[in-house]
């Protein structure tokens, strides 16, 4: 060790344990445009002050450890440490706080969602001084955004590829999700597409099982796509799930899809992992494939209000990692999703600049600097009676996906697809004529059903189906 290094390392070093807040709680800090900002919902253990809890989060997710180490003297901690710069109590909750942490950009590898999450939500979530910890939102600086490719194509390029404008796209998940042979699966795809849907979909756990190997499924689905395209004159697609046990196998499946000439593949991005997802997104852009993203496993991470990570963070991460569609809840169906919260992260997926809006759960203004947008997919327990609400809530730039709401039609798959297409066209026309979908939705569907026996049959089957459960994850009540 040189004398110069020895002197620097030894000056001011005192072994032992010191409070995190002495180093990592800096309320005077002015955040920089290049900082990654995080909003954490922190529930400290009894007796732990909020300043110490917030500082502990900043420390353990950046440069800190449980004790003072002499190697701190070999670098500039002030340059690299995370800082808890603001703390606010959560209204209506005892001993719970929103702690804001700023991270210098040098802590993160360029173009790596994996590295970003490893730092920010790594070991800190198991920290004993905290009863619970949840990452509510991130502000990703434009300097870091620019190191990512983002979605393979984005909303406008997808519409141009499909030649479909002025309405939401329609999809359907093939059911039963497991157990069909490849040929019967392809037949179900064909019936749905010829009936008027734009897409059909592999379910998230359809990979390559003994009853249906992936290559057989790809071949029969490609045949269904081309046959339905020839009959309808519309471009069709099926989300071929390329998720696999290894990245190499995943890319091999995507290559097969490209060689078959189909327009879109699919990935389970949380179970598959961000490294695999980013690799697939790059392949899709280079080879002209659209990429549909399923969020299987998200509720393990995001459903509990006090611990984990909010889906808006996972949605931002997906836009950076890459995907052209992602499942985003329905508000009206069988899966979790409160309206204001859902619309908040739907805008984060689609828009270029999203302003801070705590009434929708958005903690920071986010500028995507022209990164392509992602189409939100509404899927799960929806049927024709939901069509007006879905059209009003999600607007044109969305995919409305009816699985049971297509395949459960009493006359079969194709009539089920016809019913959904007629309902959608009726809602879009009514909206364009200035009618109020929220108020007149049922009347609009009834009027359309007079001219479509398929829609009339669907209306009769699902007239009493509702999912009246309260959302678990709700916005905080404002302080009175």
Curated annotation (Swiss-Prot):
GO BP of this protein: photorespiration; reductive pentose-phosphate cycle
Residues where N-acetylproline is found: 3
Reactions accelerated catalytically: 2 (2R)-3-phosphoglycerate + 2 H(+) = D-ribulose 1,5-bisphosphate + CO2 + H2O; D-ribulose 1,5-bisphosphate + O2 = 2-phosphoglycolate + (2R)-3-phosphoglycerate + 2 H(+)
EC id: 4.1.1.39
Active site per the UniProt annotation: 175, 294
Subcellular localization: Plastid, Chloroplast
Keyword Heme: no
Cofactor field: Mg(2+)
Record: residues binding substrate: 123, 173, 177, 295, 327, 379
GO molecular function: magnesium ion binding; monooxygenase activity; ribulose-bisphosphate carboxylase activity
Chain positions listed as propeptide in the UniProt record: 1-2
Gene Ontology CC terms: chloroplast
Entry note: cofactor: Binds 1 Mg(2+) ion per subunit.
CDD domains documented for this protein: RuBisCO_large_I (cd08212)
Residues annotated with N6,N6,N6-trimethyllysine modification: 14
Entry keyword set: Acetylation, Calvin cycle, Carbon dioxide fixation, Chloroplast, Disulfide bond, Lyase, Magnesium, Metal-binding, Methylation, Monooxygenase, Oxidoreductase, Photorespiration, Photosynthesis, Plastid
Residues holding Mg(2+): 201, 203-204
Residue(s) at site: Transition state stabilizer: 334
Positions of post-translational N6-carboxylysine modification: 201
PANTHER family (alphabetical): RIBULOSE BISPHOSPHATE CARBOXYLASE, RIBULOSE BISPHOSPHATE CARBOXYLASE LARGE CHAIN
Note: The basic functional RuBisCO is composed of a large chain homodimer in a 'head-to-tail' conformation. In form I RuBisCO this homodimer is arranged in a barrel-like tetramer with the small subunits forming a tetrameric 'cap' on each end of the 'barrel'.
Protein's job: RuBisCO catalyzes two reactions: the carboxylation of D-ribulose 1,5-bisphosphate, the primary event in carbon dioxide fixation, as well as the oxidative fragmentation of the pentose substrate in the photorespiration process. Both reactions occur simultaneously and in competition at the same active site.
Record-given protein name: Ribulose bisphosphate carboxylase large chain
Organism: Gossypium barbadense (Sea Island cotton)
